[in-house]
């Protein structure tokens, strides 16, 4: 290892005592990956909530993202590619964010004391973001792996079958709150950090943040209920396997 690299590793500065730019670059990458994931979360919620319109609407949305505009029957592998990309971004964002986590009990106690003494709203929001981010890394990874390996199962019958019969309802209720809280807090903190809305006060941004949280959680719960209802209907209609659920979705396809 070069002497300059050793100095930079210990002190965060180059040989000439110039502040290393690596930390700023890592911070930018963390912000960029977080923004991509937050925007994906917003788009994803609107897409899956299409089941609130109708089963056919949800099926058409699923097929659209399989490239049905260009391929007559759609290609589920396209969804797998997107899922793989999101997994990579999620992992990168998680590792970048870990730099700022308390790494031992002593650091955690320092943070807890600081949080208690400051009684600052944004410090509390960071703590919520850290907890939800930790949970989301594991919960979202399971969901994304299913999307990666079983993209053909996405549809009103297939997705609701996974909800009820495969018992994914338990994972999804925790994932819903983790994603919506983490994402809205993240966008709020990014807006302050990078000065995106300089004409809006911090109080105004907080109101927008809480409005986003409430809106997407309510939308998510309504969507969650719709998939549960559809999953129970699947059972009543005698759909016993995922393959049968996929075949039921196929009836929406128009030649």
Swiss-Prot record:
Primary role: The fumarate reductase enzyme complex is required for fumarate respiration. This subunit anchors the complex in the membrane and binds a diheme cytochrome b.
UniProt-annotated binding residues for heme b bP: 93, 182
Name of the protein in its database record: Fumarate reductase cytochrome b subunit
Disulfide cysteine pairs (residue numbers): none
UniProt organism field: Helicobacter pylori (strain ATCC 700392 / 26695)
Cofactor: heme b
Gene3D superfamilies linked to this entry: Fumarate reductase/succinate dehydrogenase, transmembrane subunit (1.20.1300.10)
InterPro entries: Fum_red_B_TM, SQR/QFR_C/D, SuccDH_FuR_B_TM-su
Family matches, as Pfam families: Sdh_cyt
Cofactor note (record): Binds 2 heme b molecules per subunit, called the proximal (bP) and distal (bD) hemes.
GO BP of this protein: tricarboxylic acid cycle
Single Gene Ontology MF annotation: metal ion binding
Family the entry assigns: Belongs to the diheme cytochrome b FrdC family.
Localization terms from the record: Cell inner membrane
Record's bilayer topology term: Multi-pass membrane protein
